[in-house]
Design a protein with these regions (language model features):
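A short, local hydrophobic-aromatic micro-motif
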Residues: 104-107, 129
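Gly/charged, well-structured mid-domain segments that form the phosphate/adenylate-handling core
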Residues: 108-112
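Active-site core segments that coordinate phosphate-bearing ligands/cofactors
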Residues: 43, 54, 59-69, 79-90, ...
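Intrinsically disordered, low-complexity segments enriched in glycine and mixed charged residues
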Residues: 1-53
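Conserved alpha/beta enzyme-core scaffolds, especially Rossmann-like or related mixed alpha/beta domains
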Residues: 69-74, 103-105
Length: 286
């Protein structure tokens, strides 16, 4: 509800040609949203964003500050990059109160980002090549180089990403449209859905509810659960992400009966991860 964010959303809503969906503007994982949300004075946003990008770039550190660059995949994560035109979007930057001049030079993901000797560790400088965002790197490493191929990575949450080829695709079902990478002069795009609670569900079962001692117990408990159980769990501890984007949603359990026990509850919690991933994949298919 920060006024800077509300102002940006209002301006972006009038610029439908930019391809920015409202749920993306609300997504705190985007850098522009986080920076605006932290600032009390709009004129400080550009300065703070420039420093945040500089500190966060491995390239800048590797080159001793000689290069201020990012690749296309990381640029797309700022919410300030025009995904269709392949450049910093002046209208979006203006909406967030950010000067495009403070943003890094965008380089092909397999391009030359500079030279490094690792702070004098190497006898001679070597070129820095191959820069990707984390989810994009996982997509590439899993061999999803063709349209229609997808990956799901699991950690605290989960990222489900699908390669949609060399043409921009705007999701109508709550997914984020983004860039996969730009290599050999060819840009490829993705659809992505992020789930907030995946592995964190098992951590919650262990640390907060103390229903398990370690995640390995979950499989045995799932097999031990009553197969007729119809318990369902929604891990909306911080709302729901893609494809629902319901920030006011709360966690809940359905279908508990007198015979519901530890095994049935743990199974429902474990299955909630799969159901969330299914929702994202179903949105991709649609």
């Amino acid at each position: 509800d920060h006024p800077g964010v509300n102002r940006a959303q209002a301006q972006l809503a009038r610029r439908s040609s930019l391809g920015c969906r409202r749920h993306v503007c609300e997504n705190p994982s985007h850098l522009a949203r986080r920076i605006v949300g932290r600032e009390h004075q709009a004129r400080r946003v550009a300065h703070q964003l420039g420093h945040a990008l500089a500190r966060g770039q491995l390239v800048t550190q590797l080159t001793g500050g000689a290069e201020f660059r990012c690749d296309w995949s990381n640029a797309s994560r700022t919410q300030l990059f025009d995904l269709r035109r392949g450049c910093w979007s002046e209208p979006v930057c203006q909406a967030f109160g950010i000067d495009p001049a403070c943003l890094p030079q965008v380089t092909d993901s397999d391009g030359l980002f500079g030279m490094t000797d690792l702070g004098g560790f190497l006898p001679a400088p070597v070129p820095v090549h191959g820069v990707l965002g984390d989810s994009h790197a996982a997509l590439f490493a899993q061999g999803c180089h063709s349209r229609g191929m997808a990956k799901a990575t699991y950690g605290t949450g989960s990222s489900v990403m699908m390669n949609v080829g060399d043409e921009f695709v705007a999701s109508l079902h709550g997914l984020s449209s983004s860039l996969a990478w730009r290599m050999d002069g060819v840009t490829e795009y993705v659809l992505e859905g992020n789930v907030s609670y995946a592995g964190a569900v098992k951590t919650w079962l262990r640390d907060d509810l103390e229903l398990i001692n370690n995640p390995e117990e979950v499989t045995d408990l799932c097999y031990a659960a009553n197969p007729a159980s119809r318990v369902y769990f929604v891990p909306a501890f911080t709302g729901l992400g893609a494809p629902h984007w319901a920030s006011d949603a709360e966690g809940c359990v359905f279908g508990m009966t007198r015979t519901t026990g530890r095994a049935e509850f743990v199974k429902a919690a474990d299955e909630s991860i799969a159901y969330q991933i299914f929702d994202v994949i179903d949105a991709m298919v649609e």
